[in-house]
Amino acid sequence: MIDLLIIAGPTAVGKTDISIELAEKLNGEIISADSMQIYKYMDIGSAKITKDEMKGIPHHLIDVVKPHEEFNVSSFKVLAEKSIKDIWNRGKLPIIAGGTGLYINSLIYNYDFTDADRDEKYREYLTKLAEDKGKEYVHSLLKDIDEKSYEKLYPNDLKRVVRALEVYKITGKSISEYTKENEKKLYDIPYNVNYFVLNMNREVLYERINKRVDIMMGKGLIEEVKKLESMGYTPDMQSMKGIGYKEVLFYLNGDISLDEAIYLIKKGSRNYAKRQLTWFRKDKRSIWIDKDKYSSEEEIVDEIIKMVKDK
């Protein structure tokens, strides 16, 4: 079984430095789990690690696609699994470092992103049937094949009714049976996972976030966004909707002032950190590291290594 070390946490908590120190001490390589750092040319706004900051530690899944190219959790899972195997086969430890919770979960839970359990044509047929004969009629189709769902779901909950009918058509099983089987598969992964979440005092974290935004502005975030625009990348692209980029675009378009843009970037980043912490708290397998309780990052690194070895 492959050993997998995960260093997660909210934006600006200090995942980068700790993951690099761990990689140095544990002979590891780092796989980024950051939904913005996968984009080329978007360096300042994503707080992308520089070559110097890497300290010679190989980093994977950074600068993977151009800003107009599609990239999602399924894309991440495929590339990350390939990198994990490659790193492990070379006798090194794969270390996942990042704050995109869904990316991390795609690895530590056996999510299936294939379309094996989907039938778009049948779904369209049922939706059209609901328009022609009514939602109650489509709901009644469940009665003979999935009585539990028939009793549980309301006719107005068309999306879930259609999903239950679709699952039965493809698998011959009720949605509850199907879900139960999939839940068992969720934990069937080829990794021995050590999952750590870094945290710190909320006020201190927010101060760090605000300072990071000021640093980004000083490094030339506005110029970076201007360059991206000149390269043909537009506000409707997923990459350009990232925090920092969308606000600067509003400023460049004359919709808001520069001060307002900076305020919104800071606010958006703080709210994002709050959402990240909420996400990570849901996973009972994660071990939380309160950075405030340690006198140095080296102490944190040593504590993580001790916990990994004692497991």
UniProtKB/Swiss-Prot annotation:
Pfam families: IPPT (PF01715)
SUPFAM superfamilies on file: P-loop containing nucleoside triphosphate hydrolases (SSF52540)
Keyword Transmembrane: no
Residues where substrate binds: T11, A12, V13, G14, K15, T16
Site residues (Interaction with substrate tRNA), renumbered to this chain: T100, R123
Binding site for ATP: G9, P10, T11, A12, V13, G14, K15, T16
Coiled coil listed as a keyword: no
Gene3D superfamilies: 1.10.20.140, P-loop containing nucleotide triphosphate hydrolases
Transmembrane segments: none
Catalytic activity from the UniProt record: adenosine(37) in tRNA + dimethylallyl diphosphate = N(6)-dimethylallyladenosine(37) in tRNA + diphosphate
Main function: Catalyzes the transfer of a dimethylallyl group onto the adenine at position 37 in tRNAs that read codons beginning with uridine, leading to the formation of N6-(dimethylallyl)adenosine (i(6)A).
Subunit structure as annotated in this protein's UniProt entry: Monomer.
Protein name: tRNA dimethylallyltransferase
Origin organism lineage: Bacteria, Bacillati, Bacillota, Clostridia, Eubacteriales
Gene that encodes the chain: miaA
